[in-house]
Curated annotation (Swiss-Prot):
GO terms for biological process: chromatin organization; double-strand break repair; mitotic G2 DNA damage checkpoint signaling; positive regulation of DNA repair; response to ionizing radiation. This is BRCA1-A complex subunit RAP80. The gene is uimc1. The lineage of its organism: Eukaryota, Metazoa, Chordata, Craniata, Vertebrata. Residues 476-572 are annotated as: Disordered. Residues 75-81 are annotated as: UIM-linker. The tandem UIM domains form a continuous 60 Angstrom-long alpha-helix and mediate binding to 'Lys-63'-linked ubiquitins. UIM1 and UIM2 bind to the proximal and distal ubiquitin moieties and recognize an 'Ile-44'-centered hydrophobic patch. Since UIMs don't interact with the 'Lys-63' isopeptide bond the UIM-linker region between the 2 UIM domains determines the selectivity for 'Lys-63'-linkage, and its length is very important for specificity. Belongs to the RAP80 family. Residues 525-534, 552-572 have a biased composition (Polar residues).
Length: 572
């Protein structure tokens, strides 16, 4: 306990030395230091408690806790990424807004300064200039500057708070009206009231200046106005009846600038192409034929104001080589039967072969149809049925200014000439088509000759590969396997040992000296070795059956035993 108290006092002293508090009373210093120490001790205690809980938890609970922690981290990361994406989108929208608004505003502000100077000069000299009156049917409500800004806002910034932008534009328009036209107080108030009651802003429908007479038509809102207000508008128009030629020139300049700014506005209209343009894109134009897109422009101008019609109208004299688009056809099965490999007199062809011919002629890229490229077996028979000719006319509308009727006439003439000559060309699978300007018959003959040469060279190479093997040395029969000889030796030894034991038992035992025994051992060894050597030589020289070998061995053993018995019985 004493050690723990000393450690706590040392920690408190270190905390006091680290954090110096300047105050009037000593008690406040101690309280603040103690509070800070408690705040430090609290997170340490929490950590230890959390560690204890984790240690007490089972493995499954720990896994569940780890999964929860990972999910929380993933959600936090996803949320931060979403926030960053939103900030990027906002920044991009603001930059686009600044770019789109700055261009038309710069052009309009420069023009507004010119119009202000011109109108101030002209309105000051109203009494002197009475030559160019304005038609009373018009009502000068606003300059067209605000109209262009409003249109740009409606087209480009429809997603970025359009209501606030329109209100801002309206405030600008009111200030510009008051600056442009120095009107009497009553007329100005009436005009402001009229614009406040209206729900829609006036839109310019046409700007025309002819010989100083300014004729503008404005479409005012459809809200009903009282008779007093209409009279007030008439008074307003009569009060500002005279404008000089300078105002007309300024307005014409502004109309040109506003039209240029409208073309420059970055508005992209994604329109879907009509079926007519898609089908006509396969047509290749030439200077001889009529432009088929001229009739199309009148219909497309009202329905879809896309950029494709402008692109086509800009290039009426150039040959448009667009990507080929195949016309709609019924699903057909192509007959992929192999061609005849010999030149026959039959010139008949099926309808399926005619369909293949039609497709080949439609996909040709040359300026004129080259019928020498196509196989004559397909071109041999003329078109008998009317349906086939109709399909040809529908598929091949225009091809370099030459219609299908002329092409069919040319093909018929070619067929007649081929019939007169009597030569037919048969293309084979794998043989390329004849190039332009060469005789197809000679071309096929050359290729067939090349194929023959290739086959002959292959045969020669194969003959060289197939070589006969020379006969080797004759195979001699080998001696009988060693296993049989080893087994025979083992059997002979066993039989010898058994017979020798039997013979010893039968004979009566006699006392024999040690010297006799010693003399008998080398004799027996010599006899056994001599008996084994001829037996082995006999076995190696001629293969004998197992039974014969056993009989011979038994006879030899008996003979040797008899000799041994006689030698032992003889006295020394």
């Amino acid at each position: 306990m004493g050690c723990r108290g000393q450690n706590c006092s040392e920690k408190r002293r270190a905390i006091r030395d680290h954090f110096i508090v300047i105050s009037d009373s000593e008690g406040e210093e101690e309280k603040e230091v103690i509070r800070f120490g408690k705040n430090i001790a609290q997170p340490d205690g929490r950590r230890t408690s959390v560690k204890r809980k984790i240690a007490q938890m089972t493995e499954e609970e720990q896994l569940a806790l780890a999964v929860r922690m990972s999910e929380q981290e993933a959600n936090h990361v996803n949320y931060s990424q979403e926030e960053e994406d939103e900030l990027l989108r906002k920044a991009i929208e603001e930059s686009l807004h600044s770019c789109t608004v700055s261009e038309p505003c710069n052009t309009t502000t420069q023009q507004n300064t010119n119009t202000l100077h011109s109108t101030n000069r002209t309105l000051a000299a109203e009494d002197c200039s009475e030559k160019h009156p304005i038609s009373q049917n018009c009502s000068l409500s606003e300059p067209p500057n605000n109209i262009t800004v409003q249109q740009v806002y409606k087209e480009t910034l429809s997603t970025n708070e359009p209501v606030k932008l329109q209100e801002h534009a309206e405030e600008k328009s009111f200030s510009q009206v008051s600056a442009l036209f120095e009107l009497p107080s009553g007329a100005a108030e009436q005009q402001m009231n009229k614009e406040a009651h209206s729900t829609e802003r006036p839109v310019v429908t046409g700007d025309v200046v002819e010989e100083g007479h300014l004729s503008q038509t404005f479409t005012v809102s459809e809200t009903p106005l009282s008779a007093t207000q209409e009279m007030n508008t008439e008074d307003f128009t009569t009060s500002a009846t005279f404008v000089t030629e300078e105002v007309g020139e300024a307005l014409t300049q502004y109309s040109t600038v506003s039209s240029q700014s409208r073309h420059k506005s970055p508005v992209v209209l994604l329109m879907r192409l009509s079926q007519d343009i898609v089908e006509s894109s396969s047509v290749i134009l030439s200077p001889k034929c009529r432009d088929p897109f001229s009739d199309m422009e009148s219909g497309m101008a009202s329905s879809c104001p896309s950029n494709s019609s402008n692109f086509v109208s800009m290039l009426p004299h150039k040959a448009l080589t667009l990507s080929p688009v195949f016309p709609k056809q019924l699903p057909r099965r192509l007959g992929l039967s192999p061609r005849k490999l010999f030149q026959g007199a039959s010139l008949t062809s099926d309808s399926k072969e005619q369909e293949v011919d039609d497709q080949c002629s439609h996909c040709s890229e040359s300026s004129e149809l080259d019928y020498s490229v196509l196989p004559n077996s397909l071109q041999a028979e003329p078109f008998k049925s009317n349906t086939a000719t109709e399909v040809l006319k529908e598929n091949n509308t225009l091809l370099n200014g030459v219609t299908t009727e002329e092409q069919t006439g040319a093909s018929n003439s070619c067929l007649d000439s081929q019939r007169q000559s009597g030569s037919t060309v048969h293309y084979y699978w794998g043989v390329p088509f004849c190039p332009k300007g060469e005789d197809p018959n000679l071309y096929t003959q050359v290729i067939l000759c090349q194929l023959e040469v290739y086959e002959k060279s292959l045969k020669k190479a194969q003959r060289q590969l197939l070589r006969k093997m020379n006969f080797g040395e004759p195979v001699q029969l080998s001696a009988p396997p060693l296993r049989r000889t080893e087994r025979g030796k083992a059997d002979s030894q066993d039989s010898l040992s058994q017979e020798s034991e039997d013979l010893k038992d039968e004979d009566s035992p006699r006392p024999v000296d040690d010297e006799e025994v010693d003399s008998e051992k080398p004799m027996n060894q010599c006899v056994s070795s001599s008996s084994r050597q001829p037996a082995e030589s006999l076995e190696e020289e001629s293969p004998i059956p197992a039974q014969d070998e056993q009989d011979n061995n038994s006879q030899l053993i008996l003979f040797l035993n008899m000799n041994n018995s006689h030698s032992t019985s003889l006295p020394l």
